[in-house]
Each structure stands twice: as C-alpha cells, then as structure tokens.
Amino acid sequence: MRTELTPIEARVIGCLIEKEVTTPDQYPLSLNALTNACNQKSNREPVMSLSESEVLDAVDQLISRRLVSDESGFNSRVSKYQHRFCNTEFGDLKLSAQEKGIVCCMLLRGPQTPGELRTRTNRLATFADVKEVETVLDKLASEERGQLVVKLPIEPGKRESRYMHQFCGEVDLDAFQGSALMTASSTAQFDDERVAHLEAEVEALKQELAELKSLVNSLL
C-alpha cells in the first residue's frame, strides 16, 4: 500500500531525505533547520513560507504514522528529526539510491522530465545518462512497485513527458490530459486571433499605401 502524504508532509519528507544525503553532518534536523529547508527558495516548487508550528504539526502527524522519528538524546533541549520513509528495517518501501534520489526530487519539486531529474539529482544519486533515469522511472511506475510515479501526458509545445510521484494521492491523468488540451486549444485560438489581427493590419497598410500613391499621382 502506497503512503499518502499532504503537500506539507511531502515537503518535510523530501527535505529530510535531501539533507540526510547532502549534509549528513547536520542530520537529523532540528525543527528550525527543517523549517528553513522547507522554505528554501532554491530547489523547491512551489516555494513555501511555512511557520515552525505548521512544520511541527506535519512532523507530529508523520511521527504518529512512523514515517519520522525524534532522535533527540537523553536530556537534549532540542528535538532532532529523521525520516523513516524508506529503507527502514521493518518498512515496506525499499528504494535504491537512484530511486530515492528521484523520489526526493519529485517530493521537493513536483512533476519533472527525465532530463530535469538527471540534472537536479546530481547531489543525491549518479546517472550515466537520461536513458538510465528513464529506466529507473519505468521501474518506479510499474504495477509491481505500486506505481510510485506516473508518466504525464506531453504538454503542448514540449518534447518530453514529465513524471509525477503519487505519494500525495493518485494522479488524475484525465485532468492533466484535459488541461493539456485546453492549453493547446487556447494557444491555437490565440495564434488564429494573432494571424487575423496581422492580416487586418496588412490590409490597412495596403489601403494607406494605395491612398498615398493616389495622392502623389494627383500632385504630379
């Protein structure tokens, strides 16, 4: 069964996974460090502005579901938190370093193309090329793995499909398809209107030119 998270819980888990790999000497994280990580302006989509209270509420919910643990030492004045989202002794979700990097990046930044994921996971995992990213995505998207990610319809004007995690609930592909079609329709309508406007301007210029020629001829 796939874990289902709220957007704030997804941000908390993503930050804990990220900092576990990129700043291991500062991990587990204090509430202040975790809040700062959640509100980072770089490598986050969308950018959030969460209070410590909001982050703590999410952490408490995750602790109750055994997805986060408080690793504070005895008599410690500051609580320190680490994720138990994957690769725990008794947990069901086991991810390779590459899978973990991709999932982390998606939790922090939402839908992304394989090319974007390869670039953005460079501190989390190593991929030889985009093809290797696609291979890992295919595994994560398989029914055997519980369809942890899903391939989205190609957006109008784009060459690559984006992939989205399903830890915040099952992705409505029909809604994405409808949105893409509406965008394409709006773009086509805008193009038609623009062409019609340009054609009208050309006709007006032709008319003005004809009038100027007529005026010049009358003066000769």
UniProtKB/Swiss-Prot annotation:
Coiled-coil parts of chain: none
Annotated Pfam families: DUF480 (PF04337)
Gene3D superfamilies: Winged helix-like DNA-binding domain superfamily/Winged helix DNA-binding domain (1.10.10.10)
Classification via SUPFAM superfamilies: Winged helix' DNA-binding domain
Lineage: superkingdom: Bacteria
Protein family (similarity comment): Belongs to the UPF0502 family.
Entry protein name: UPF0502 protein VVA1225
